[in-house]
Amino acid sequence: MAGNKGRGRAAYTFNIEAVGFSRGEKLPDVVLKPPPLFPDTDYKPVPLKTGEDEDYMLALKQELRETVKRLPYFIEPPEEKQDDIERYSKRYMKVYKEEWVPDWRRLPREMMPRKKCKKGDPKSKPSKAAAKATSLINSADVLKTIEELEKRGEGERSDEENEEKEGSKEKDKDDEEDGEEDAEQEDYDEEEQEEENDYINSYFDNGDDFGVDSDDNMDEATY
């Protein structure tokens, strides 16, 4: 029951005895020492020769190596100077590169670089007559386009003038209507002012004149 349902210890999937250990045996101790640097050689190197000749050859070899490093044997492409951006660090930089100009008299002609000229195909070159015809066609097209543009400009100008005339007429009509409305408003305002100013006239009546005409026909009292 313990092996199939996930309980108990897991069983080993490989044979330990095949590795060289038996069950219950201790593993060997871990070695913490570094390995030897170089294995023992059967043939030992010959000791270097010392003396004035060897020292002279060594100094000569070193001097030759340094001179070869300084010579411009490696031709580099010229750097393009960018004058747009001036950097502060470039002001004090010293250029140690030397321009190498070889003496071509001592070198073969095959080593001399040559500029390659691009040769065009004869088929691709147009003839003079075809070039003239294309130039005439282009000039005629240019004249046509200029005439069309002039016509368009004249049409636009006439349209603008008509629009300006119509706009001026509409403005005149609006001004006349505004003048009539202003006149009507002034008349109306005058009538209102007259009605409002009626209180200036005196309408007071004390009643003395009441019945003056009727006294002539009335009979006086007799005593």
From Swiss-Prot:
Keywords: Antiviral defense, Cytoplasm, Immunity, Innate immunity, Nucleus, Phosphoprotein, Transcription. GO terms for biological process: cell population proliferation; defense response to virus; epithelial cell proliferation; innate immune response; positive regulation of innate immune response; positive regulation of interferon-beta production; transcription by RNA polymerase III. InterPro entries: RNA_pol_III_Rpc31. It holds the Pfam family RNA_pol_3_Rpc31. Signal peptide: none annotated. It is found in: Nucleus; Cytoplasm. Residues 173-198, 206-223 have a biased composition (Acidic residues). Component of the RNA polymerase III complex consisting of 17 subunits: a ten-subunit horseshoe-shaped catalytic core composed of POLR3A/RPC1, POLR3B/RPC2, POLR1C/RPAC1, POLR1D/RPAC2, POLR3K/RPC10, POLR2E/RPABC1, POLR2F/RPABC2, POLR2H/RPABC3, POLR2K/RPABC4 and POLR2L/RPABC5; a mobile stalk composed of two subunits POLR3H/RPC8 and CRCP/RPC9, protruding from the core and functioning primarily in transcription initiation; and additional subunits homologous to general transcription factors of the RNA polymerase II machinery, POLR3C/RPC3-POLR3F/RPC6-POLR3G/RPC7 heterotrimer required for transcription initiation and POLR3D/RPC4-POLR3E/RPC5 heterodimer involved in both transcription initiation and termination. This is DNA-directed RNA polymerase III subunit RPC7. It comes from Mus musculus.
